[in-house]
Amino acid sequence: MLKLLIPTIMLFPMIWTLNPKWLWSATTTHSLIIASLSLTLFKCYSTTQWSNLNYMLATDMISTPLIILTCWLLPLMIIASQNHMSTEPINRQRSYITLLVSLQALLIMAFSATEIILFYIMFESTLIPTLIIITRWGNQTERLNAGIYFLFYTLAGSLPLLVALLYLYNTAGSLSFISMNLISIPPNTWTNTFLWVACVTAFLVKMPLYGVHLWLPKAHVEAPVAGSMILAAILLKLGGYGMIRMTIMLEPATKSLAYPFIILALWGIIMTGSICMRQSDMKSLIAYSSVSHMGLVASGILIQTTWGFTGAIILMIAHGLTSSALFCLANTAYERTHSRTLLLARGMQIILPLMATWWFIMSLANMALPPLPNLMGELMILVSMFNWSNWTILLTGTGTLITASYSLYLYMSSQRGPTPNNLTFMELSHTREHLLLTLHIIPIILLMIKPELIWGWCW
């Protein structure tokens, strides 16, 4: 893992010593090299055991795709932020890139930690750079309110997890992911019920599950483009990754305690999808769409089947790339219209036809059109849900229909219709923006051609 961590850490002195003229191009190039280097983790991919194992860090079939996604996203965030950060003083630009790089370093350590307490520390540490990015570089004064929601929801969910980890250490004598899988917890005792809820709550808030999701739309709407990208693509998946790890460890208790959470997750798919149909704010619609998709991921994980886990991992990776691209597209519209309102951005297809093509492709990816990896993930979760209970097809089927509806609503509202007069003298699209979206779709195409890279246990 040091082959990724050391180059990432070496970015810090580079950022603060570079000539301002080369700041953005050099950091983008360096981060792209790290992203290319991360692809070598697939070579160490082992279907039966941990790879790159040392005392503190290791990778396996769950963490490898998420680490690579984290490394791939840093250059994309830097490219996306160039335009709106160019007017800032040079030291603020350096601070901004430093926060993005520190997030990557923390996330790599979180995804590759073998000790649960190290994972917990890194899980909480990602909160600090994200909070600074939202509250310092957000667009409006509501960013402070969004930051408070983000901070207190996450902290309130994480405190019970810390208590549960201390209890686990006292009873089991170890907090290693590798050894904890061998220790079974006896079911049907009040202590273990509270232990299971405490361990899972932090990750359900982070995903987020419907009911504890109110921080996410606020944080997404107020964050700058890089904040929205990292939040949608990686930080929500940190909750899913933690759930996969913890529910396997708490296995006997999961089967009996997961039922209400599965039903809440499925109900949340329909509710948040319905909320999307009523949104007038572009970023808010994409944010609620993320809550809907994460509800499907949560239900797939809580089912505790091989297909459920694999579908959840595939959907997390595919959704990370798709939602990040949608936030980039929303940012391109915002930079030209200075508004996130869908009605003020309509008719842009006539002025920016290539950008409208990107909107169309990403809207189709969001609604899980074949043969995209989004469909693979959703199908595997739907099949495992149907095998668990035939009645779930009513909720998941309705949720899929609503997802298709709001994805098309997003495209039609933002691209079709008469062009408002204020958009007549709009700035044309840049090569930088098309490069950014191309770098989003290349991994999606790769996963269409070779899906076994992220199929985990099912391959």
Swiss-Prot record:
Reaction equation(s) it catalyzes: a ubiquinone + NADH + 5 H(+)(in) = a ubiquinol + NAD(+) + 4 H(+)(out)
Any GO molecular function: ubiquinone binding
InterPro entries assigned: NADH4_N, NADH_Q_OxRdtase_chainM/4, NADH_UbQ_OxRdtase, ND/Mrp_TM
Transmembrane segments: 20-42, 61-81, 103-123, 148-168, 194-214, 224-244, 257-277, 284-303, 307-329, 350-370, 392-414, 435-455
Keywords, sorted A to Z: Electron transport, Membrane, Mitochondrion, NAD, Respiratory chain, Translocase, Transmembrane, Transmembrane helix, Transport, Ubiquinone
Subcellular location as annotated: Mitochondrion membrane
GO cellular component: mitochondrial membrane
One example of a Gene Ontology biological process annotation: electron transport coupled proton transport
Keyword Coiled coil: no
Top EC class for this record: translocase
Enzyme Commission code: 7.1.1.2
Membrane topology of the entry: Multi-pass membrane protein
Family: Belongs to the complex I subunit 4 family.
Purpose: Core subunit of the mitochondrial membrane respiratory chain NADH dehydrogenase (Complex I) that is believed to belong to the minimal assembly required for catalysis. Complex I functions in the transfer of electrons from NADH to the respiratory chain. The immediate electron acceptor for the enzyme is believed to be ubiquinone.
PANTHER family: NADH-UBIQUINONE OXIDOREDUCTASE CHAIN 4 (PTHR43507:SF20)
Protein name from the UniProt record: NADH-ubiquinone oxidoreductase chain 4
Species annotation: Polypterus ornatipinnis
Source taxonomy: Eukaryota, Metazoa, Chordata, Craniata, Vertebrata
